[in-house]
Amino acid sequence: MNKTWWKNSVIYQIYPRSFADSNGDGIGDLNGITAHLDYLKELGVDVIWLSPVYQSPNDDNGYDISDYQAIMKEFGTMEDFDRMLSEMHKRGLKLVMDLVVNHTSDEHHWFMESKKSKDNPYRDYYIWKDPKDGKEPNNWGACFGGSAWEYDQETDMYY
């Protein structure tokens, strides 16, 4: 029987910010991960699952992505990422990226466009609701406390 690779692999998740700091700024980074690849391989790791490293205002620990095509500066550069990936492959390691596609940062280009008008082509990428009796559309709470809704004065709607 031919089993798929992820069914028999040792997968190690790395949260970059706290894994390994290569430049002494107190924040883990891609070069710190690269420096520890031999150690991870010796542990028997087959696959590295990397938490988000994309550009983000970091209001949600990097899960609020503002640019899916850029690396957050504190983690390094795209060149650092390419080098890390190349070094992983040299060691026979696979990489799984944590890709957040069900929401973006409010600083993402799509969201900023969606706020410009009610008929913007990006408007339907997000949930927009009219106020209910001058207040939030419902009582949904945010994971971090308070209301899940933010008011947009420009369009008189909540998102």
Enumerate the language-model features and the residues they cover.
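Acidic/aromatic-lined carbohydrate-recognition and catalytic surfaces
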Residues: M1-Y159
